[in-house]
């Protein structure tokens, strides 16, 4: 899980979702997991 100031889609499987005010990226590639913070 990477914590970044701005999250971006890395590949076409990445999905940007918001869970209680936290922006996250979920993907089939676990190295692409990110959260904004």
Curated annotation (Swiss-Prot):
UniProt cross-references to Pfam families, sorted A to Z: Ribosomal_L36
UniProt KW keywords: Ribonucleoprotein, Ribosomal protein
GO cellular component, one term: cytoplasm
GO biological process terms, semicolon-separated: translation
Keyword Glycoprotein: no
Keyword Ribosomal protein recorded: yes
Entry GO MF terms: structural constituent of ribosome
PANTHER family: 50S RIBOSOMAL PROTEIN L36, CHLOROPLASTIC, LARGE RIBOSOMAL SUBUNIT PROTEIN BL36C
Family assignment from sequence similarity: Belongs to the bacterial ribosomal protein bL36 family.
The name this protein goes by in its record: Large ribosomal subunit protein bL36A
Species of provenance: Neisseria meningitidis serogroup B (strain ATCC BAA-335 / MC58)
Top-level taxonomy: Bacteria, Pseudomonadati, Pseudomonadota, Betaproteobacteria, Neisseriales
Gene: rpmJ1
